[in-house]
Amino acid sequence: MAKKVIRVIKLQIPAGKANPAPPVGPALGQAGVNIMGFCKEFNARTESEVGMIIPVEITVFEDRSFTFITKTPPAAVLLKKAAGIESGSGVPNKTKVATLKRDKVREIAELKRPDLNAASVEAAMRMVEGTARSMGIVIED
């Protein structure tokens, strides 16, 4: 018989840098999960992606065991890295902060596609372009 799920926790943690300090510790402590066990496993699994923020979905079972799934970094983080900027525009409709080529957007869309609800790469590209627009990044051909 399958184990009973008691909670699903969603967090965004820098790759390779999970530690028991907030926000990880309190979120997992409330669920009764072995915090250090999670941190070691997460850091080992994400050590190749250091510097990125990795969304993680932790499933906690009745016997306090857990499994977790790491997802691709948020589109906004990938766009900021590609454009070489620290943050998006405060007024994206007036102030543009960077320009990206459509090829770079395609790369990001292909990377994000498993986590996006998109039927094709073109649909995923439109989603990524929308995120870029809302950050004040101009997309050119």
Curated annotation (Swiss-Prot):
Phylogenetic classification of the source organism: Bacteria, Bacillati, Bacillota, Bacilli, Bacillales
Subunit structure and binding partners: Part of the ribosomal stalk of the 50S ribosomal subunit. Interacts with L10 and the large rRNA to form the base of the stalk. L10 forms an elongated spine to which L12 dimers bind in a sequential fashion forming a multimeric L10(L12)X complex.
The species this protein was found in: Brevibacillus brevis (strain 47 / JCM 6285 / NBRC 100599)
Cited InterPro entries: Ribosomal_uL11 (IPR000911), Ribosomal_uL11_bac-typ (IPR006519), Ribosomal_uL11_C (IPR020783), Ribosomal_uL11_C_sf (IPR036769), Ribosomal_uL11_CS (IPR020785), Ribosomal_uL11_N (IPR020784), Ribosomal_uL11_N_sf (IPR036796)
CDD domains tied to this protein: Ribosomal_L11 (cd00349)
Protein name from the UniProt record: Large ribosomal subunit protein uL11
Molecular function GO terms recorded: large ribosomal subunit rRNA binding; structural constituent of ribosome
Top-rank lineage group of the source organism: Bacteria
GO cellular component: cytosolic large ribosomal subunit
Post-translational modification: One or more lysine residues are methylated.
